Amino acid sequence: MIGILNRWRQFGRRYFWPHLLLGMVAASLGVPSNLSGVPDHAALANTSSSQSRQNHGTTNFNSLALLHDIHRRPSFSVDYWQQHALRTVIRHLSFALAPQAAYARVQEVAETERVAPSKIQQLALLDTLNALLTHEFKPPAIIRYTEQVERPVLSPYKPGLWLAQVQGIRAGPANLS
């Protein structure tokens, strides 16, 4: 009986919880927190600007197509539990992808002979996962161009000229007198 419970616990730790956590994170990324349609009245004061924000952010599941118009995350702040879940998923992936003593074996082999491309790709993936776990995310820098590009002044759009030039159709009188 103890063996069955131990195997069930190992199965849950290896397969069930990481996949459940990954599904929860994937389902919650990019979706507004008030998707249920109930505005959070406790967090906002009763002012006219906060009421307009509540009305603007309230969505239901039948209007998910309108979500692309809503600016979902105006700042780069990440929810603590979402960040914790992402790090846990990345940690699970890194442990699942890392063979026993992969770094030591591949480094020894690399010194003596060429390494297979799959091992190099696996190490690159592990390094990327390690970087995701250990480095803090910084928002991208805003790059502003100091020079303005000189563009030629175009005449206003005239459908008759366009038809004459592109389509070869004369649209208008023969003489412009």
UniProtKB/Swiss-Prot annotation:
Primary site of residence: cytoplasm
Top-level taxon in the UniProt lineage: Bacteria
Compartmental location: Cytoplasm, Cytosol; Periplasm
Any one GO CC term of the record: periplasmic space
Assigned keywords, A-Z: Cytoplasm, Periplasm, Signal
Signal peptide span: 1-37
UniProt GO molecular function: translation regulator activity
Family that this chain belongs to: Belongs to the SecM family.
Function: Regulates secA expression by translational coupling of the secM secA operon. Translational pausing at a specific Pro residue 5 residues before the end of the protein may allow disruption of a mRNA repressor helix that normally suppresses secA translation initiation.
Protein name: Secretion monitor
Gene behind the chain: secM
